[in-house]
């Protein structure tokens, strides 16, 4: 239903912009993180940093491949980072050759969805006011995703599931609008 909205109204409903005290539209923190440029983001959140590394066992090699938000040749925002990293993670997942009944190949498996959700959750639940950034490290078949901030539910609630306390609910909503998480 939002496809017919004007851009400003769409961004307001998405919570990417809001009216400031002068009545003009300004980006929200969530909007800045999701759609902004890294150099603007770091004006507000100086420790903002997104880092994806593919490492190996050879200590002489720091990494085999790296994407980070300060490269300068892409936006450095969390949505573009998500898309770039998801592509790298997806490429490593083995997908058996199976056709659906309509003849099309199944090209995604549950592991794709789990990796996508883990990355989106790390980005949506991060404490961007913290002292460090988000780090995703792939080493062989292992993947480590860490973000600044502590978990906001009890250990029991975490393991039981179903009780979320998002640190950045508007970022979570934005991921939801692109069918992630």
Briefly describe each language-model feature range.
Residues 1-132, 137-166, 177-181:
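Active-site helix-to-loop segments that bind/position phosphate- or nucleotide-bearing substrates
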Residues 171-173:
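C-terminal lobe/lid and adjacent interdomain/linker elements of RecA-like ASCE P-loop ATPase modules
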């Amino acid at each position: 239903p939002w496809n017919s909205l004007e851009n400003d109204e769409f961004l307001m409903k998405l919570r990417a912009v809001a009216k400031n005290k002068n009545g003009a539209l300004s980006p929200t923190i969530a909007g800045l993180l999701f759609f902004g440029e890294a150099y603007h983001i770091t004006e507000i959140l100086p420790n903002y940093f997104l880092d994806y590394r593919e490492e190996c066992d050879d200590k002489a090699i720091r990494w085999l491949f790296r994407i980070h938000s300060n490269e300068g040749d892409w936006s450095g925002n969390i949505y573009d980072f998500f898309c770039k990293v998801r592509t790298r993670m997806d490429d490593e997942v083995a997908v058996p050759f199976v056709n659906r009944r309509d003849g099309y190949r199944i090209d995604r498996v549950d592991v794709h969805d789990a990796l996508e959700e883990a990355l989106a959750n790390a980005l949506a639940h991060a404490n961007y006011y913290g002292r460090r950034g988000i780090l995703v490290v792939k080493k062989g078949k292992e993947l480590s995703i860490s973000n600044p901030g502590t978990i906001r539910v009890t250990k029991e609630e975490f393991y039981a599931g179903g009780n979320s306390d998002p640190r950045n609910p508007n970022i979570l909503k934005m991921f939801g609008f692109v069918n992630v998480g």
